[in-house]
């Protein structure tokens, strides 16, 4: 007599040989079953008009295999919080979220100091959220997210100068004859609070 198993509670795919014939003792053995998605499951065994539902059992995550930026870092001014918050996901081979996994960010391209809480644990959805990041120096940057042996590089983003807080003569006026051009040219420099030049002001 053939017996067929189906996944009757919970999501995912019940893989393996799901139909087996009973042996001389009336027992059908299913030795290669697997389910790809986590959660509480039941399987139903069917033989002709007969059915029976198994006890509930739980599928848990396998090891972390994939790391991705969900919310990429956005452009920001020097010293300002990068918003919206940067988020990173950790999943297993089947896309199941991995919770409780530490993720660390570092500045992998560009100069400056990446400030904020640089290590966060993933939540129940497999997401690590970095809500207080900032960088002090201007330019094009990339972040790298690291979780164990996994790593991923963010899209490029740009840090621009903050509001000017310092003004100084970088080229003082020189003595000159009345009516003559003062040379060399007089120059004035504007810097923000982090020492970045402020352009277009």
Go through the PLM ranges and name each one.
Residues 17-25, 116-127:
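Short, acidic Ser/Thr/Gly-rich low-complexity loop/linker segments typical of extracellular
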Residues 20-22, 33, 54-57, 120-122, ...:
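Generic detection of short hydrophobic beta-strand segments and adjacent strand-loop junctions
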Residues 105:
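Major-groove recognition helix of helix-turn-helix-like DNA-binding domains
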Residues 28-31, 128-129:
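Short strand-edge motifs at loop-to-beta-strand transitions and within beta-strands
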Residues 32-39, 134-139:
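Surface-exposed, short loops/turns at beta-strand junctions within beta-sandwich domains
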Residues 2-4, 8-13, 40, 48-99, ...:
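Short S/T/G/P-enriched beta-strand
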